[in-house]
Amino acid sequence: VHSVVDYVSAAEHQVYPWGINDPTEGNRTTLHLPWLKTLSTDWHIDGKGWYSTTRGNNAIAQENPTGGPEYENNYRPKSPLFIFKYPYSKAMTPPSSYRDASITQLFYTTNVYHDVLYILGFNEKAGNFQINNWNKGGVGGDYAILNSQDGSGVNNANFATPPDGQPGRMRMYTWNASIPERDGCFEAGIVIHEYTHGVSNRLTGGPENSRCLAALESGGMGEGWSDFFATAIRLKPGDTRATDYTMGEWASNRPNGIRKYRYSTSLTTNPHMYVDADGLTSVHAIGNIWASMLYELLWNLIDKHGKGDVTKIRPVLKNGVPTDGRHLAMKIVLDGMALQPCLPNFVQARDAILDADKNLTQGSNKCEIWKAFAKRGLGVGAVFNLSKRTGS
């Protein structure tokens, strides 16, 4: 047993590291466990055993070429020495030729994100995804099932979120708008976007009720939260509020990504306002508006509190409050999800974020939050009406 523990503690994963969104931003490297000390367990341990494959307490990752519901007996890489190093290049084809690298990348990105969210408050009591909750609250038995190269679709991805105690399921697809086709597992923003659906569905209305984002506007905000976290996590050291970001650009092979507008604090580059949601029937279109507001919030808080060292994975907290504006924005947005009602609208979600900041910092960021929302028409006088919103 001692030798197995030694191997696990020295596990290696060859991946695009945290902060590199896709193959255009950097190179793969070999990383060693552990990166983060959280209250959850090791990535390859669940309290019942050690797994010399892409399985652990937080996630189980495998290929799923048929697109079917089975996963436990599906193929996943195995390494008795816990060395997960496999070849991949953008020129390799077909995708099945690099399935080991794809599964390993998906497993890595998801586990890092789990640990970051844990520090920010998405833990066992909040309804996170873990097999073993270590008697810390919530319901266990629900790691995230991660399907790489899932055969049930293309040019997309999804995450199914049942109530706490039942595993979530992420399906990652290949994208065929380029030659060779591209694997969404190598675009971290897509993985983070999908996992965040699990987070927002578990937090809104409580972990026992995962249907609280089922309405059009709340579902749209679900897409927006997912884009927001994917974007906040990929910030670079030299970024400023003048930096714009796309969503899904690499996988889709579209220079402007898969949203109508880039995420930008410029009203010229991204003119989205609250009232633009009138008449929209697409949750992704509504989400583009909501995430644009959150991007304003992100930069208002960064300008006030600094960006921190974005090359470091672990959020730094003092008395439970993130010390940098980036993680502070992520924290109050997370906390707001838990405070808002079931089936919230933009106004209610905005108010929940204000309440979250009041609970966390005694409201010291109230002005920055109001300015962010008011800039895009969700100020003090904004009123929700599904067909005719009032901007302010």
From Swiss-Prot:
Keyword Hydrolase among record annotations: yes
Family: Belongs to the peptidase M36 family.
One Pfam match: Peptidase_M36
Subcellular location, record wording: Secreted
GO biological process, alphabetically ordered: proteolysis
Cofactor binding notes: Binds 1 zinc ion per subunit.
Listed cofactors: Zn(2+)
Protein's recorded name: Extracellular metalloproteinase 4
Main location: secreted
Domain of life of the native organism: Eukaryota
A cellular component annotation (GO) from this entry: extracellular region
